[in-house]
Amino acid sequence: MYFLSLPSLVIVIPVGYLLFHLGYNLFFHPLRGYPGPLLWRASSLPWKIALLRGTMHHDLMRFHQKYGDTVRIKPDEISYANAQAWRDIHAHVPGRPEFLKDPVRLPLAPNGVMSILVSDTKNHARFRSLFGHAFSDKGLRTQESTIVQYADLLVEVLREVADTGRSAEMVYYFNMAIFDSIGALSFGESFDSLKSRQLHPWVDAIHKNLKSVAISHVLRSMGIEFLTPYVLPKELRGKRQENYSYAVEKLNKRMKMEGDQGDFWDKVLVKSADDNQRGDGMSAGEMLNNAAVMVVAGSETTASALSGAMYLLCLSGKIEKATAEIRKSFASPEDIDLISVSHLPYLTAVIDETLRMYPAVPGQPPRVVPASGATVCGRFVPEETRVGVSHLATYFADYNFTHADKFIPERHLQKTEEPFKYDNYGAYQPWSVGLRNCIGRNLAYAEVRLTLAKLLWHFDFTLDVDKTGNFLDQKIWSIWAKRELYMFIKTRGTSSSSPQ
């Protein structure tokens, strides 16, 4: 009888197992009937590579264009690009278990404590209740002076680079302004980036930490997350702890302040101090993790929306129409406030269209189908399957939006008119839907509206096409890895400062 040698067995057994695994995923797996690229259906390796490279959501756009609104992108994961999926996956349905976020794709804090981003249904509701006042209309009115203060300070800083004939890098300035604002709203004090004309190092730590999070996600999916410190590139090592340390320092200072500061923590600290062990306040560890989440979510989303809006306005030529609406509506910049800018229809349409083409949070973790399975888009999906809606694939699909690849703010003002009356606006959910939709949506809209209004009232902007290139061609690690955005700035009423 012939027996394979030991060296041969070392090769044959793993190869045989691999072939069996690939064959099962393609021909016998419960999701075998879903379309998708062959290698992605057979193995999770292409998915891991795309996640590490930051190209996942651009790949999903290509796949949905080829295979339709439902695509299998991993042996156990399905991506959707339609309105029904938002409702089936994210909407709250009484009596139905929640589709929880995939734990493999969630960033874990060094202290292992939950935050509003990483929590079960019960604790998520507790966190939202505690932060509810800060993000309510009443809370926004309290925060308005802070938002106005940093928008005005941004205007003053941009005066230094206006009318020089040289283009200014706007992502840098938006990051400074919004990071200062969110610092004041999160911790009762600014990071003073605009005053120092220098970005706080926490911004760099945030961006590099997100890349390291992608690496840890891949290793966690393989059961070897403990190797993360050993495989991270040198420049990324320690960024997770550095990001955490900044939050510790700032929150400790905030907790020592007496009285209301007009920030996110006023009601939380009072409620937590008076908790009496009922469990409806926050522990110190929970406050810390939520503080870190608020800074990242509150600064990056708004800075991205501002950058995207300015680029798309200038590239499309729509900036003249937006500027005209603002200057016609306000005789003085002091007249610009949160209430008045909310009544500018075209500016609001500009923001909505920006978030369609350049969503503030392009990468969201998929949800996990609960026990016993569920029906998604008319088909039964077995439990433990990962399911999600791709923002970019959904918003750039021609079956959802007319001229989907074009920046047309008017589509949001003419929903019942040709050619936009057939657009599927239910598919447009930049802030998600359901119980876990973005709690900071109103604040983000307020900051973007007011900042754009202030800038377009004071200045004329022209895109420096040569230095900027295609601004939308960016990688994504949960948030955009933003390119530089160069613009010529001239003070309103002066001659053009851009080169002829």
From Swiss-Prot:
Gene3D superfamilies reported for this sequence: Cytochrome P450 (1.10.630.10)
One GO BP annotation of this record: aflatoxin biosynthetic process
Organism superkingdom: Eukaryota
Record protein name field: Versicolorin B desaturase
UniProt main location, coarse: membrane
Membrane topology field: Single-pass membrane protein
Sequence positions that bind heme: 438
EC number: 1.14.19.n5
Keywords, sorted A to Z: Glycoprotein, Heme, Iron, Membrane, Metal-binding, Monooxygenase, NADP, Oxidoreductase, Transmembrane, Transmembrane helix
GO MF: heme binding; iron ion binding; monooxygenase activity; oxidoreductase activity; versicolorin B desaturase activity
SUPFAM superfamilies: Cytochrome P450
Cofactor list: heme
